[in-house]
UniProtKB/Swiss-Prot annotation:
Protein's organism: Mycobacterium phage D29 (Mycobacteriophage D29)
Organism domain of life: Viruses
Protein name in UniProt: Gene 21 protein
Gene: 21
InterPro entries reported in the protein's UniProt record: DUF5403 (IPR039452)
Amino acid sequence: MAKVYANANKVAARHVDVRKRVKEERDGVTRRARTNLARANKTTRITKEGYFPASIEEVDGDVDFHTVLHAPNAFALEFGHAPSGFFAGTDTKPPDPEYILTRAAIGGTVS
């Protein structure tokens, strides 16, 4: 019978080679996310020109490495949303989802 060690996953996840490879993968996701964010910065908006307070940040944890989208409403930027604010209650096309992080993570298009 095989013996399973309780801490095997914890030890493997913290191994220097594993951390290096996971960080390399995250770095690729971050590069793609920054490219996607730059493409999403459209000029057709009601806010002042050049106003696009969104950014991509890398966060290193004890085990995991993350790519984070910071924006006033990052969820709406990523997945789209119904018209709100100035456009609430109007018959207008809702903003399309940008899938900035999703496309960066899968390395392509969202079907």
